[in-house]
Amino acid sequence: MADSNSGGKGGSGYGLGLSTRTQVTGYQFLARRTAMALTRWRVRMEIEPGRRQTLAVVASVSAALVICLGALLWSFINPSGQLNESPIIADRDSGALYVRVGDKLYPALNLASARLITGRPDNPHKVRSSQIAQQPHGPLVGIPGAPSEFAPTSPASSSWLVCDSVTSQSGAGAPASVTVTVIDGKPDLTGHHHVLNGSDAVVLRYENDTWVIRQGRRSRIDASNRAVLLPLGLTPENVNDARPMSRALFDSLPVGPELTVPKVPDAGKPAGFAGAPGPVGAVIVTPQISGPQQYSVVLADGVQTVTPVVAQILQNAGTPAGNAPVVVAPSSLAKMPVVNGLDLSAYPNGPLSVRDIRDNPATCWWWEKTGGEARARTEVISGPTIPVKASDTDKVVSLVKSDGSGREADRVFFGPEYANWIEATGNDPGSSTTESLWWLTSSGARFGVENSRDARAALGLTAQPSPAPWVALRLLAPGPTLSRADALVRHDTLPTDMSPAELVVPK
């Protein structure tokens, strides 16, 4: 048998190739059979107790290992928790919140209060209610109405809008209602939403005054002064059909010079420079070889270039030089001193392109500031609706204390790249002041935050807050101040909300 494998190298045998696998397994079988004959007095080999015992041990160890791994996984998914020294504790069954002070557990009104009391930004440690019941308890503590959600955002730019939506009531002569919406985040400028630029304008009414809104600000206009209305391209319909403006939008828009007949000092008196073509206040026109004619007005110490609109307004109001502008040759005009005594920044270069308020009942003041820039950018948006995507209109939150007065926000929307950790700043685009700190909730409420390192660290608000104009921030529903002193208060009962609103349950 050995001779049959002596010529093969690297075959299927063991060791030096002196035996085959079949020979080895046969030998092992004979050894097991001999052992069974000596111990069991049997040689039929129907069963092998030793192998069964080995398999049983392997199966038991495997089952125990699987059970242990399953228990470990379940402890991560649904931990039972231990009280230990955790400062903030939550009942795993009911969700009730507790804060540990000394050797007692105090029911906490909210997470903000619990964090301020402990001075740590910990999340609640969930334990069984039976463990909580074994501990000594104290009364209710914390700030009523404080938030329990803290996930600060850090957008690259801060964007805020104050929007008016005018809705006409049914019936002839019925007053129009104005809904104020505050948008925190980027507006949707698709569709028919239009940013006013150039000669674009919106005409709105506040109380008894009419205002022309353009270039990010508002300018008052006398609705009865046709000498001004006609050159500006404003029709009686534009003025008479002007829709109301809320106090919120009125305060947001910076005021510009009034659109009226420019007041020329010492009008009618002789000019004080040589070669004056007429008295102070006279309008002069200079023909040009190419391009439109150039208009100027005579002042006491020189001439000031004006737009055709301003020249027409002055001419309509009547000038000391008569009903027609004085024609001055370019060579003569070049010898006259040039001055800038009149502020004419509110007047456009040409007639205004007034947006039809019936087709565009929504008007928004937009404030945006990018991180690292010194100045904010302000613009006015006009459109058929507020600049929110149609798919997101159901996410607009209606505030409970909405009264339609226009002094507070009726609705709030958090758009793309919104900011909820805020520092208030001035309304001027160049304002660099940083005032109070605020935390905003998804329900549209604002909470003042104590401006101390300990309070900010306890609430987990250590990132740099985003700027927001106070004129928009103040429109949100105010909440209590988040400070440690206000959190360290015990209560037997809580005050009742004196101005609640009914929750309508769908049938």
For the regions a language model picked out, list residue spans one by one.
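Short, surface-exposed polybasic-aromatic patches that bind anionic ligands, especially phosphate groups
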Residues: 1-507
